[in-house]
């Protein structure tokens, strides 16, 4: 514990305080004390608590503790609740809380329900008198929970932990508040250990290297000692043991972890040397630490610790909520308020200043400092330090009144190599003309306004558990707006110094919300406008917009940043991306997406350039119209968000790593832009990481089990205070899991309903789409072919969607200069069509492959001339629809995955890729990442003509599918320029994720061989004329793209697929019609993904062949079954002959059929391999889930077993006590029957006590009246008056040791009469003695009680001596076992003594004044004598029994006689 010499040490030296032993510790009293102390402190403020309320208990004259009347009155009047509730629940000052009901209602609004033993507490319960304490405790507990949720949220904790922990295990992420608190303590303590390790190493290093370094006295000695001993010596200096906290209460009893935590935050106040950290802690050590903590809290934290030492030491489960609120307050002090003394410890290099001298920097800055330290990249500093300055200049984020956001500004930057649960989006400028504009450094980096979404992107373990952990203040949404967009134009500007042209939407949102732009389901469009996600219903209506690029970005924006899967997605995934690509990505170019991004690999890999977002978008993007209030649709929205987040981090569901734009290759995440010169992470590596990362990658189903299971995950621990009222009952912590069961079922049913609705909708739409496609196929295709010679590059259309292409083509002819704008905007006709046939266009269901071309040429020439205004309008509306659609698609993907898991029939599913993939370009984008490994890897790329490679269908399978949906954007200009690369366009097979790539069984679609449209140009690729700007941009972008392709060695496996498809359809299309069934799709029609966007120049050898896809029957049905993926049921398949689709292919005569066979084989092999991987991943996930469930089960069982053991132990102790008591009684009986005269001499007289069960029967004295005449009381009390007490004996130890239950009871406030009755019945047997030994005494005799009463109460004192003796003699003469004293009235004035026969219930007078006999009707009151107190107490009973010692009769019975009172009578006789 440090040197005693130090003054602080002197202060720390202490004597172990006296504490109550466990056996005497009253748990219920402790709970009441803790709750009241906390409530009073919150109601009045710690400093101003009224004196009489500081200690809620008082002790009465009988040593009984009671709650003080003032406290009781305040509780009954609700004043305390109203005061505290107004503070905690932030109630409107204009409408203060009045009364219990108001507080209960306010809590209910927060989703917290006051329950006492699963029963809702009502105002009546709280008004009851005498006070019903359990109801009040429940009320206080709920207020504490509200306060806890206000102070701490899972998101805040994770954000905080990111500062101190470089690596996250997704399985570790907390799933409720208690877990979050433990997670925080553990992460901080781990970080503290790391710091101490580093300091120790540097110290050793310093001493070893410093020539004239500090010379310890033993330095030379150690030089002489053999190395192995020296090593042991250093080991002895091992770091102190800071235990892991696994059970918040139990592991906190020694104070080690908590004291270490406090030391970390306040190293100058609580030094490590002051803390007792040992492997095995003694009781004294634990008390020392606990005292240290209490001192610290009293001195520095405003007395926030309302526990006694015993409370913290014994840690009863009843005070869990108190402990949580205490920890929440600590978190608030250390991470939010951060007073000057809070200076988190950092590594101090040898000789550096002590921590306490370092400037007080907010933790967030410290976190930033960590990042900076971890990478010396000046680039990072320029990017991140400056933005911070700027944002601070601009006023930083506005603090919302909600404490949830108190954690504030500059999101906590994850430390280097963090497995990003969150990613940071940043700019990687392309070498483009607007590079200069993208001055990234000016961008303000602002912490995510809401921490809500962080956990959503977390791994499946807790995937949705905390989804809706909504801060109790309920102000989530408003606060977000307040912080982020109080005025999209005003405040946003303050966050973003650059004008909107300079920043792409990415920057606006991502930079603003490093921890997750959407965390509260609030999206920002590219201009920072708030867009809230649409509900499912809205999305369903808008489904047709699926393929439209949600926003087309301005080319200039492209230079500034990337989007993951398009603007919407980028927003959605920003939660993940932000942290993901956090500084690490920037500072660690080579691994930008390396292991760091395990959880979010998917996103990381492919950031789609934002250029696709239309410049024309207003700040008032129509997406804004779809705002859904956070509170109103919490269930659905949170689910959506979560799904997004989860998917984003899910390799398969998340948007696949395949970028959707050609430039995907230069992923922002990978910092791949050619200009950046950063080494790109290969997709293969990412894939490998994904496979290894149990968390984010757990297969598609990993993060979302089938709907029911997903919801199960979601609910059990979702203490979502405000989400579902029913659940709020759970507010009291995880212990109330039973309440959640019904909620789980309820939610599961709702999800199931939703799923069915979506499925039905999906099927309808797919059917409609199929028809539409068939109709439009030929026309569209021919139109495209006709126009291909016009010189317009279809690429753009491909990316943006079929419609876009046509518009683009037409416009390109007319206005080359306006090409960019034209490309982004959609033609009116396309839009109309998309609206009329939403299904045909948007939800392209794979049911029938439609030639993308159909859609490309939907617009008529007249439409080409549409003016900008109209196009802009339509673009906006389509984008609006797209945002909704993306949500819906995401939901549908999730549901499909869940369905797959349920069906578990992977082999029977066939995949059909519907042509809807607007253009090969699109596919190319999607697959690029994958194929990058393919031909692109092989082919050298020139900066000018980068050829994006197609990922093989297999590699792209699932991922690309999801990607393509989100990433459909108008291709970038450079994309248009790409030279033909011979490649096969294989559409992604992950049908589920793409509405358009939906799974169909062969039956649904005539089994068609998957046809790959290969556009290849035998001759030199001709470049399409492009607008200058396009040309400028293209080289750099392409370069980036190519680089990324090169870096994806992993994808090279796909090489076999290389086809001669000129991805850049701008080349003449001399393609071989590869009617290649994809391995699995061997017999599946794959819509010719190639969008016939043809380069203006006509392909030299273009043979257009029309192939009836139905003719392409699978060689064997077996192939089809192989295709069936993830157990889609056969029923989904339609009859093979049902539909016949025609595909158009360009055939290259020079291609041999055997090439196709080889490709087919390669595809099949890859497919099988992927299937195996998927299965393996699923199995791993299932095993993990099973293991987790098993753990939970085991813990529950252990808890239950402990309780059982405890119960059994107590029962055993009780039984043992009863047994001993019985034995003792029997021994006493034996003694009575066979008295041993010698015993009396040895026996000590008992002190005052009525517990006769332990008294040996006294022996008859040699002189004086028979023993029976002795008053038992006098015998026991050693009263000097008693006949045989020669001297007053001290209270005998044996008596104290054998306190009978009755004695304990009376101490604890049991009713006196009960105690007395017990003792009298026991005592009668033991004390019976005298001449009549032949008669076995009755166990019910109260003779000795009556003797005691007469001697010490009724006839005490010298005055009554004569009367007393006479009556005692009468008693001895009587054979009766039971006697009754008759009182005059309730004043207990003695009148006479009666005998009572319990069997016959006769009461006859023995001596004194009164009726000869008394009947039941005459009795008015019954009394019991308490020997301890020497007084009678009234028994609230009507029936006379042997346990009664005295009675009164009705007063009218006395009035008739008026006898002289015994006191007058007897003394005269005497």
From Swiss-Prot:
Q: Mind telling me which GO cellular component terms the entry cites?
A: centrosome; ciliary basal body; cytosol; Golgi apparatus; microtubule cytoskeleton; microtubule minus-end
Name the organs or tissues of expression. Present in the soma, axon, and dendritic shaft of hippocampal neurons (at protein level).
Instruction: Give the highest taxon in the source lineage.
Output: Eukaryota
Q: Which SUPFAM superfamilies match?
A: Calponin-homology domain, CH-domain, PRC-barrel domain
Bias category Low complexity: which stretches? 663-682, 935-946
Where in the sequence does UniProt note compositional bias of the Basic and acidic residues kind? 686-696, 796-835, 1020-1037, 1044-1056, 1167-1233
Bilayer-spanning residue ranges: none
Alphabetical keyword list:
Cell projection, Coiled coil, Cytoplasm, Cytoskeleton, Golgi apparatus, Microtubule, Phosphoprotein
Task: Tell me the PROSITE patterns matching this sequence.
Answer: CH, CKK
User: How does this chain assemble?
Assistant: Interacts with CAMSAP3. Interacts with KATNA1 and KATNB1; leading to regulate the length of CAMSAP2-decorated microtubule stretches. Interacts with a complex formed by AKAP9 and PDE4DIP; this interaction, which is PDE4DIP isoform-specific, recruits CAMSAP2 to the Golgi. Interacts with MAPRE1/EB1.
Its domain comment says: The CKK domain binds microtubules and specifically recognizes the minus-end of microtubules.
The function of this protein is:
Key microtubule-organizing protein that specifically binds the minus-end of non-centrosomal microtubules and regulates their dynamics and organization. Specifically recognizes growing microtubule minus-ends and autonomously decorates and stabilizes microtubule lattice formed by microtubule minus-end polymerization. Acts on free microtubule minus-ends that are not capped by microtubule-nucleating proteins or other factors and protects microtubule minus-ends from depolymerization. In addition, it also reduces the velocity of microtubule polymerization.
Q: What is this protein called?
A: Calmodulin-regulated spectrin-associated protein 2
Organism, scientific name = Rattus norvegicus
């Amino acid at each position: 514990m440090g040197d005693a010499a130090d003054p602080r040490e002197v202060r720390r030296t202490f004597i172990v305080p006296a504490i109550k032993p466990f056996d005497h510790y009253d748990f219920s009293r402790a709970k009441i004390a803790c709750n009241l102390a906390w409530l009073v402190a919150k109601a009045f403020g710690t400093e101003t608590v009224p004196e009489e309320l500081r200690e809620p208990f008082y002790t009465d004259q009988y040593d009984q503790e009671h709650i003080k009347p003032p406290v009781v009155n305040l509780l009954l009047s609700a004043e305390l609740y109203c005061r505290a509730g107004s503070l905690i629940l932030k109630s409107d000052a204009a409408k203060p809380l009045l009364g219990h009901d108001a507080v209960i209602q306010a809590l209910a609004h927060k989703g917290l329900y006051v329950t006492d033993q699963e029963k809702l507490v009502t105002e009546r319960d709280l008004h009851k008198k005498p006070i019903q304490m359990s109801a009040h405790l429940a009320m206080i507990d709920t207020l504490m929970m509200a306060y806890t949720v206000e102070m701490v949220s899972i998101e805040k904790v994770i954000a905080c932990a990111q500062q101190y922990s470089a690596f996250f295990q997704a399985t570790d992420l907390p799933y409720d508040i208690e877990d979050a608190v433990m997670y925080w303590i553990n992460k901080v303590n781990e970080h503290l250990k790391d710091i101490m390790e580093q300091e120790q190493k540097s110290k050793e290093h310093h001493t070893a290297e410093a020539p004239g370094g500090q010379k310890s006295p033993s330095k030379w000695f150690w030089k002489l000692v053999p190395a192995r001993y020296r090593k042991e010596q250093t080991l002895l200096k091992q770091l102190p043991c800071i235990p892991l906290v696994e059970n918040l209460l139990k592991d906190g009893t020694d104070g080690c972890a908590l004291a270490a935590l406090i030391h970390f935050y306040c190293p100058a106040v609580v030094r490590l040397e002051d803390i007792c950290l040992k492997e095995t802690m003694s009781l004294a050590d634990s008390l020392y630490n606990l005292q240290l903590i209490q001192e610290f809290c009293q001195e520095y934290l405003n007395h926030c610790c309302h526990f006694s030492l015993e409370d913290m030491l014994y840690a009863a489960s009843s005070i869990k909520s108190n402990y949580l609120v205490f920890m929440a307050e600590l978190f608030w002090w250390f991470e939010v308020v951060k007073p000057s003394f809070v200076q988190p410890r950092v590594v101090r290099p040898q000789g550096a200043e002590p921590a306490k001298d370092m400037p007080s920097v907010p933790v967030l800055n410290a976190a930033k400092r960590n990042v900076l330290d971890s990478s010396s990249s000046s680039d990072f500093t320029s990017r991140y330090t400056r933005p911070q300055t700027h944002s601070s200049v601009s006023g930083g984020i506005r603090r919302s009144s909600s404490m949830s956001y108190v954690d504030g500004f500059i999101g906590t930057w994850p430390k280097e190599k963090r497995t990003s649960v969150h990613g940071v989006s940043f700019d990687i400028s392309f070498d483009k003309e607007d590079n200069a504009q993208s001055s990234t450094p000016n961008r303000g980096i602002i912490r995510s306004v809401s921490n809500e979404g962080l956990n959503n992107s977390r791994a499946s373990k807790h995937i949705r558990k905390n989804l809706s952990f909504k801060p109790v203040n309920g102000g989530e949404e408003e606060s977000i707006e307040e912080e982020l967009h109080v005025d999209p134009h005003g405040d946003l500007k303050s966050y973003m110094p650059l004008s909107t042209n300079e920043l792409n939407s990415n920057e606006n949102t991502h930079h603003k919300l490093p921890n997750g732009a959407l965390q509260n389901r609030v999206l920002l469009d590219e201009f920072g406008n708030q867009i809230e996600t649409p509900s499912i219903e809205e999305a369903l209506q808008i489904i047709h917009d699926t393929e439209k690029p949600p926003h087309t970005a301005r080319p200039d924006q492209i230079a500034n940043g990337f989007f993951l899967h398009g603007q919407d997605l980028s927003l959605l995934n920003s939660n993940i991306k932000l942290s993901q690509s956090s500084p690490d990505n920037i500072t660690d170019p080579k691994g930008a997406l390396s292991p760091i991004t395990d959880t979010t690999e998917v996103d990381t890999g492919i950031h789609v350039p934002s250029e696709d977002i239309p410049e024309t978008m207003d700040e008032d993007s129509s997406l804004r119209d779809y705002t859904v209030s956070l509170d109103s649709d919490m269930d659905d929205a949170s689910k959506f968000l979560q799904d997004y987040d989860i998917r984003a981090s899910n390799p398969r569901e998340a948007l696949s790593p395949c970028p959707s734009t050609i430039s995907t290759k230069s992923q922002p995440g990978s910092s791949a832009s050619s200009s950046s010169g950063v080494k790109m992470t290969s997709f293969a590596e990412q894939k490998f990481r994904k496979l290894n990362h149990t968390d984010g990658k757990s297969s598609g189903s990993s993060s979302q089990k089938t709907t029911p299971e997903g919801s199960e995950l979601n609910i059990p621990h979702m203490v979502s205070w405000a989400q579902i009222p029913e659940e709020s009952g759970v507010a009291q912590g995880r212990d109330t899991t039973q309440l959640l069961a019904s909620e789980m079922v309820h939610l599961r049913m709702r999800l199931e309903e939703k799923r069915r609705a979506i499925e039905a909708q999906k099927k309808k739409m797919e059917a409609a789409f199929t028809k539409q496609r068939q109709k439009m196929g030929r026309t569209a295709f021919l139109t495209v072919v006709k126009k291909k010679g016009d010189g317009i590059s279809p690429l753009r259309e491909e990316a943006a969607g079929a419609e876009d292409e046509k518009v683009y083509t037409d416009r390109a002819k007319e206005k080359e200069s306006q090409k960019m704008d034209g490309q982004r905007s959609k033609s009116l006709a396309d839009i109309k069509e998309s609206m009329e046939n939403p299904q045909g266009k948007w939800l392209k269901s794979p049911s029938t492959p439609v030639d993308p071309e159909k859609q490309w040429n939907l617009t008529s020439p007249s439409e080409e001339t549409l003016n900008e205004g109209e196009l802009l309008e339509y673009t906006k509306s389509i984008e609006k629809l797209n945002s909704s659609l993306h949500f819906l698609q995401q939901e549908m993907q999730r549901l499909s995955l869940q369905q797959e898991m349920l069906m578990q029939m992977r082999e029977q599913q066939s995949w059909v890729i519907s042509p809807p993939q607007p253009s090969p370009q699109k596919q190319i984008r999607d697959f690029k990442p994958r194929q990058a490994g393919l031909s692109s890897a092989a082919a050298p790329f020139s900066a000018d003509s980068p050829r994006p490679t197609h990922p093989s269908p297999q590699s792209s399978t699932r991922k690309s599918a999801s990607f393509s949906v989100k990433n459909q954007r108008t291709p970038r200009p450079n994309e248009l320029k790409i030279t033909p690369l011979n490649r096969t366009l294989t559409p992604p097979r992950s049908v589920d994720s793409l509405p358009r790539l939906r799974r169909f069984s062969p039956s649904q679609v005539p089994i068609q061989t998957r046809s790959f449209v290969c556009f290849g140009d035998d001759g030199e690729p001709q470049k399409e004329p492009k607008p200058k700007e396009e040309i400028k941009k293209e080289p750099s972008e392409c370069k980036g793209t190519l680089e990324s392709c090169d870096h994806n060695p992993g994808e090279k496996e796909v090489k076999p697929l290389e086809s001669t498809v000129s991805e850049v359809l701008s080349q003449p299309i001399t393609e071989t019609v590869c009617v290649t069934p994809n391995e699995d799709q061997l017999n599946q029609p794959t819509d010719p993904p190639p969008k016939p966007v043809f380069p203006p120049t006509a392909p030299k050898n273009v043979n257009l062949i029309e192939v009836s896809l139905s003719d392409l029957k699978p060689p064997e049905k077996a192939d089809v079954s192989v295709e069936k993926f993830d157990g889609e049921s056969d029923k989904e398949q339609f009859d093979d002959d049902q539909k016949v689709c025609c595909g158009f292919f360009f055939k290259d005569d020079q291609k041999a059929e055997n090439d196709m066979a080889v490709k087919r084989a390669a595809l099949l092999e890859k497919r099988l391999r992927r299937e195996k991987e998927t299965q393996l991943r699923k199995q791993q996930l299932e095993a993990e889930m099973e293991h987790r469930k098993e753990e939970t089960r085991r813990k529950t069982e252990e808890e239950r077993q402990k309780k059982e053991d405890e119960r059994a132990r107590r029962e055993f102790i009780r039984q043992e006590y009863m047994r001993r008591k019985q034995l003792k009684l029997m021994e006493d009986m034996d003694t009575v029957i066979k008295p041993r005269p010698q015993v009396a001499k040895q026996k000590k007289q008992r002190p005052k006590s009525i517990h006769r069960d332990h008294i040996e029967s006294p022996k008859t004295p040699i002189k004086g009246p028979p023993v029976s005449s002795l008053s038992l009381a006098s015998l026991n009390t050693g009263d000097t008056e008693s006949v045989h007490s020669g001297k007053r004996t001290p209270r005998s130890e044996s008596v104290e040791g054998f306190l009978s239950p009755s004695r304990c009871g009376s101490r604890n406030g049991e009713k006196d009469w009960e105690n007395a009755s017990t003792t009298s019945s026991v005592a009668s047997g033991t004390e019976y003695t005298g001449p009549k030994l032949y008669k076995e005494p009755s166990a019910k005799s109260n003779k000795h009680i009556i003797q005691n009463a007469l001697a010490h109460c009724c006839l005490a004192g010298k005055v009554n001596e004569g009367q007393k003796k006479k009556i005692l003699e009468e008693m001895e003469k009587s054979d009766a076992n039971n006697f009754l004293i008759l009182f005059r009235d309730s004043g207990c004035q003695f009148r006479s003594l009666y005998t009572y026969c319990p069997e016959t219930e006769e009461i006859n007078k023995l001596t004194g004044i009164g009726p000869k006999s008394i009947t039941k009707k005459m009795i008015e009151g019954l009394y019991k004598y308490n020997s301890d107190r020497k007084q009678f107490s009234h028994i609230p009973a009507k029936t006379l029994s042997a346990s009664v010692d005295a009675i009164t009769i009705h007063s009218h019975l006395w009035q008739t006689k008026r006898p002289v009172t015994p006191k007058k009578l007897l003394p005269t006789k005497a």
